[in-house]
């Protein structure tokens, strides 16, 4: 690999594709806490991170698996779960004194209306100021899960609802009423965070 004196080995996290150091430096120059949104194959993670000389400090944290404690039976990777996770993390960050932040989506592609921006919408609706473009946020109908409910109704007419939503149905969650469940979980998060 490094056979001559002119070859420079990149940082390990850059080689692994985990960190874009130029983007990280630009975010740190803002001197604001970062809203770090990460998605896995099953969950959404939202963290408020502050910079310290010896390393980053986690100010507040929310993981979409925590939504089960608030009565959310619909899994942790869909758009409504991303919104609720962002909202929960922002409520915790407000308790810690955060009023503004800057978004860090890492090396994920910036796609309009994605789960990453649904989490950002949850942070914004909780009252934390984050610079953003309003066009990038998903529609209110998608945030409440109405696209999932309409798709479930269409599949029920075709007779293939059990095949597509087997995980929800196994947990006793009806995908056609996801919007009502979203509203009740949002109220519970607001009540527990304010109370």
UniProtKB/Swiss-Prot annotation:
GO cellular component, one term: cytosolic large ribosomal subunit
UniProt KW keywords: Ribonucleoprotein, Ribosomal protein, RNA-binding, rRNA-binding
SUPFAM superfamilies referenced in this protein's UniProt entry, alphabetically: Translational machinery components (SSF53137)
GO MF annotation terms: 5S rRNA binding; structural constituent of ribosome
Biological process, per Gene Ontology: ribosomal large subunit assembly; translation
Pfam family, one: Ribosomal_L5e
Keyword Zinc-finger assigned: no
Family according to the record: Belongs to the universal ribosomal protein uL18 family.
Subunit composition and interactions: Part of the 50S ribosomal subunit. Contacts the 5S and 23S rRNAs.
Protein role: This is one of the proteins that bind and probably mediate the attachment of the 5S RNA into the large ribosomal subunit, where it forms part of the central protuberance.
Name used for this protein in its record: Large ribosomal subunit protein uL18
Gene: rpl18
């Amino acid at each position: 690999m490094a056979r001559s004196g002119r070859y420079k080995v990149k940082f390990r996290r850059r080689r692994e594709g985990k960190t874009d150091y130029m983007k990280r430096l630009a975010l740190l120059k803002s001197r604001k806490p970062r809203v770090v949104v990460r998605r896995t194959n099953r969950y959404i993670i939202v963290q408020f991170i502050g910079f310290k000389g010896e390393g980053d400090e986690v100010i507040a944290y929310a993981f979409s698996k925590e939504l089960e404690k608030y009565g959310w039976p619909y899994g942790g990777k869909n758009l409504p779960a991303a919104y609720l996770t962002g909202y929960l993390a922002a409520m915790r960050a407000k308790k810690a004194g955060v009023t503004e932040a800057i978004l860090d989506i890492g090396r994920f592609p910036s796609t309009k209306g994605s789960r990453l921006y649904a989490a950002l919408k949850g942070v914004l609706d909780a009252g934390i100021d984050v610079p953003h473009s309003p066009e990038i946020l998903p529609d209110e109908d998608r945030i409440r899960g109405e696209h999932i409910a309409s798709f479930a109704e269409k599949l029920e007419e075709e007779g293939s609802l059990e095949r597509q939503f087997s995980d929800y149905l196994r947990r006793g969650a009806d995908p056609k009423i996801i919007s009502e469940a979203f509203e009740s979980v949002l109220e519970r998060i607001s009540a527990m965070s304010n109370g």
